[in-house]
Amino acid sequence: TISTEEGEKRPDFIFIDTQGNIDVVEIKKSYNASVLAKSNKKSTRNNYVPSRDLTIAIMQIEKYIYHLNRTGLKSETKICNTLREKNHIDMPIRIRNPQGVIILGRSNELNEEQQSDYEVIKRQYKHIADILTYDDLLNRLTILLNHFENK
C-alpha cells in the first residue's frame, strides 16, 4: 500500500525488475470492459475515444505513480521491508520514474478503424502506461513462447 494524505492506496500489482526499479500494474478483471467508446460529437469527428473504464484505469495509474514519486524514500523502505518479511527477498527498491501497465478488455473484434484509434490511444499514453487488452497480452505471451521454443 502507498500511504497518502487521501488514505492508503493499493495498486493491483507492483512489478520489480532485477535492479529493484518498480512499475505499477492495474488489471480490470472484466473481459467485457471496453477499451474504446464511439464519440458522436461533431468536435471529435466520430473518432473512437478511450472508454470510461480505460479512462478510470489511466487515472488510477497516474495517481499511484504520483504518490509513489511524492513518497519516494518512505515507499521504497516500506516495499523493501514487505519483500523481506513476506518473501524473504532482500534487495534495494528504487522509485525512479515508475511506469504503469494497464490490462483490460478485448481487442480481437475491433474493426480496422477501431484498431487504428486504439493504437493512437496506446501511443498517446505510452509515457504513463503500457495499455494492453487481454488479447494483446496473450499475443505477446504466444510470441515469447514461440521465440524460446524455436531456439
Regions found by a protein language model. Name each.
Residues 1-151:
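Charged, terminal alpha-helix-loop-beta segments
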